[in-house]
Swiss-Prot record:
It comes from the Eukaryota. Pfam families: SIL1. PROSITE patterns: ER_TARGET. This is Nucleotide exchange factor SIL1. PANTHER family: NUCLEOTIDE EXCHANGE FACTOR SIL1 (PTHR19316:SF34), PROTEIN FOLDING REGULATOR (PTHR19316). Required for protein translocation and folding in the endoplasmic reticulum (ER). Functions as a nucleotide exchange factor for the ER lumenal chaperone KAR2. Residues 1-18 form the signal peptide. A motif (Prevents secretion from ER) lies at residues 411-414. It comes from Candida albicans (strain SC5314 / ATCC MYA-2876). GO terms for cellular component: endoplasmic reticulum; endoplasmic reticulum lumen. Belongs to the SIL1 family. Keywords: Endoplasmic reticulum, Glycoprotein, Protein transport, Signal, Translocation, Transport.
Length: 414
């Protein structure tokens, strides 16, 4: 949730025993092929706020905050008079006391309710639920983990999810939530079994918020869970409404920020996630289609074109169509995915007549159709192959080109 103010939720103190790192030797290079895009492993503080980059070690005794607008952690040197100044961040200058964590939670709840009165009103209606014992992270997690369908108090579940959704925007709470496999698995179970879509949406919001721009939290999920977690997300996509689809895709979009996850699920060499996203796209709602096209854009599997037409055309269906076309033009698809991707592209253009094929794709399609004529000479040329070759020929003219050209093409075949 985006606030207009900066709120520090840094409820921890960096350990005083952190090792000193030689910055001349210890560098972090996100892109091994770009040595200029490196930064020191040890964060070097100044008197000005600086963003703490992924993987950096932080020296002890700094003033640390979370920028809620950018969801980035920042730090600077602690000034002598800073403790007496009325600031909008909570400064952690020593060991964290229990009441400090409670104060952070309480202030965060008040800030949220002041900006969203409907939340405060909704909570007021739940008179039978004690809010005090579910307003902190540990109590909310305990309620989630012990929840039993048809037995536990659903109103208490709502309160616990509200607390976690609020706190999960903070990077440290996101890390803490994802580091406990039992709690996160409980969230998965609740989402899969809930009959109330409001509960399901809250669960997905908690998951998405805890992972967004939080590399350590993402790493926790990738370590603690197996492929079934990702498979389950895509399975739920087909059965949910647009709101829930968008929430689920928000989780997937957070995960694709991890290069290891992308290589395993969203590369052309390991394309199970990519294939699922393309296959499910026609079943998505309008908002979810936008989120799906954003995921494809985030992957950066193809060079970004800055021509005027590309910049002006941001329609999700057009973006997905271009992605599939580029997959063919770039010869990225293996034999297993070739037919399914082509079928998806044909269906997409048949359902949306405003979509236009690119010149590069039309040239590729013409060459592909011509080259497939040689298949007839093969001894192992099956009826299935023949049917698909004819399907491509018809699609070339009826879907992507001039339908009248099909007559001439068939005549040439004869």
């Amino acid at each position: 949730m985006k606030f207009s103010v900066l709120v520090l939720l840094a409820s921890y103190l960096v350990g005083v025993n952190s090792s000193i790192v030689d910055t001349s030797e210890e560098l972090i290079c996100p892109d091994p092929e770009n040595p200029l895009d490196c930064y020191p492993k040890l964060f070097v503080p100044t008197n000005e706020w600086q963003t703490i980059k992924p993987g950096q070690d932080i020296p002890p005794g700094l003033h640390v905050r979370l920028n809620i607008d950018t969801l980035e952690k920042e730090a600077k040197l602690m000034s002598a008079d800073e403790k007496d100044e009325p600031v909008q961040e909570v400064v952690v200058g020593g060991e964290l006391q229990d009441h400090s964590r409670e104060a952070i939670t309480e202030n965060l709840q008040k800030l949220h309710e002041s900006k969203h009165p409907e939340v405060k009103q909704e909570h007021a209606h739940r008179t039978k639920v004690s809010q005090g014992d579910l307003s902190n992270f540990d109590a909310a997690c305990s309620e989630i983990e012990s929840f039993k369908p048809h037995e536990s108090d659903v109103e208490r579940l709502h309160l616990a999810l509200d607390t976690l959704e609020e706190l999960s925007h903070d990077i440290e709470f996101g890390v803490k939530l994802t580091s406990d496999k039992a709690i996160f698995q409980s969230l998965v179970n609740i989402a899969n079994g809930a009959s109330d879509p409001k509960i399901t949406e809250k669960v997905y919001r908690v998951m998405g918020s805890s992972l967004r721009n939080n590399p350590e939290a993402i790493s926790n999920i990738l370590t603690n869970f197996d492929k079934s977690y990702v498979d389950n997300l895509f399975e739920q996509l087909a059965n949910e409404n647009d709101v829930l689809q968008k929430r689920i895709l928000g989780i997937i979009q957070a995960l694709v920020q991890n290069s290891h996850f992308v290589r395993q699920y969203f590369s052309f060499d390991h394309s199970s996630g990519l294939n699922d996203l393309i296959a499910i796209f026609p079943k998505l709602g309008p908002n979810s289609k936008s989120r799906a096209s954003n995921i494809l854009e985030d992957l950066q599997l193809f060079p970004v074109t800055n021509d005027r037409r590309s910049l002006e055309d941001q329609d999700p269906e057009s973006q997905v169509s271009k992605f599939i076309q580029n997959s063919f033009v770039g010869n990225k698809l293996d034999e297993k995915n070739f037919k399914s991707y082509f079928d998806q592209l044909v269906n997409l253009h048949q359902s949306n007549k405003s979509l236009r094929p690119s010149g590069d794709f039309l040239n590729w399609l013409a060459e592909e159709v011509e080259s497939r004529k040689e298949n007839k000479k093969r001894d192992d040329y099956s009826q299935e192959d023949k049917d698909f070759d004819e399907y491509m020929l018809r699609a070339r003219h009826e879907v992507f080109g001039n339908p009248m050209g099909l007559r001439k093409a068939i005549a040439d075949e004869l």
